[in-house]
Swiss-Prot record:
Belongs to the UPF0248 family. The lineage of its organism: Archaea, Methanobacteriati, Methanobacteriota, Thermococci, Thermococcales. Disulfide bonds: none annotated. Pfam families: MJ1316 (PF04457). InterPro entries: MJ1316, UPF0248. This is UPF0248 protein TGAM_1209. It comes from Thermococcus gammatolerans (strain DSM 15229 / JCM 11827 / EJ3).
């Protein structure tokens, strides 16, 4: 499931001609949303150094919980802290 860093996974999805970014979405921590999670299609984001962008809005990478392919396969997931 977790192959490479988050930035590597997103860069591959965005720039590898064998991948179609329209087939992927990210799930971010979004307080106030149902379950405090929000899905965002990868095609809507632009990658930055410490943040990704949706239009003019900057969102830090640490808010990404998982990256999912449209078929439901999780390709990257944030490690959870042990309680």
């Amino acid at each position: 499931m977790r192959k490479g860093s988050l930035k590597e996974v997103l860069a591959k999805i965005k720039h590898d001609p064998r991948e179609d970014e329209r087939d992927y979405y990210i799930v971010i921590e979004h307080r106030g949303a149902y379950g405090n999670e929000k899905k965002i299609p990868v095609e809507m984001i632009e990658l930055g150094h410490g943040y990704f962008f949706i239009g003019e809005t900057q969102i830090p990478y640490h808010r990404i919980i998982r990256v999912v392919k449209g078929n439901g396969k999780v390709v990257w997931e944030k490690r959870r802290r042990k309680q």
